[in-house]
């Protein structure tokens, strides 16, 4: 598969923003260990958004193919459902030259308060990940990273969310 460069990703993010802003989350699935599929409804259509953190084919895109889902949803999927189901997509954004796409959802928590949950799709080869963040703190990550795995950046529930360190080489657009 072709490596996803920042320019292509920026175009994809813009298209997703145009298509999906204000769409409501209907369902969430985790068909494979590294992929999340979110079904979103606009007034006129239903879309399936694929977020893949698979090392060889990390990407975000709309998908047509229906996938087999495990009978018992994995714990990350259950958590995503708890925090995102019924939420509205308010924005899809990314920093120029970066490889992280931020999906901002307006959701209602258990107390009935409106909260903003951001799903961060970090699309960086074998370090790709999906991280759910609220108020700057990590709710959870698809691939948790503890101190043993990295002394530079940990991804664990409750820790502040920081973006990955920038690569040394410039990313020419």
Range-by-range predicted roles:
Residues 4-68, 72:
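A structured, charge-rich N-terminal accessory region that forms the first stable segment of a protein
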Residues 44-173:
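Phosphate/anion-contacting hairpin/loop surfaces
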């Amino acid at each position: 598969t072709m490596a996803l460069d920042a320019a292509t990703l920026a175009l994809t993010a813009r298209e997703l923003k145009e298509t999906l802003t204000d769409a409501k989350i209907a369902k969430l699935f985790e068909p494979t260990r590294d992929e999340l599929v979110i079904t979103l409804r606009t007034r006129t259509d239903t879309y399936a958004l694929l977020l893949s953190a698979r090392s060889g084919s990390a990407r975000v895109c709309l998908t047509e193919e229906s996938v087999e889902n495990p009978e018992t949803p994995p714990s990350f999927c259950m958590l995503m459902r708890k925090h995102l189901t019924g939420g509205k997509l308010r924005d899809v954004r990314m920093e120029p030259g970066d490889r992280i796409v931020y999906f901002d959802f307006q959701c209602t928590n258990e107390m009935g308060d409106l909260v903003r949950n951001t799903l961060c799709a970090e699309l960086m080869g074998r370090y790709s990940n999906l991280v759910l963040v609220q108020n700057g703190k990590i709710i959870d990550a698809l691939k948790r990273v503890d101190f043993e795995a990295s002394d530079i950046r940990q991804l664990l529930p409750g820790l502040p969310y920081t973006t990955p360190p920038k690569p040394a080489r410039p990313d020419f657009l």
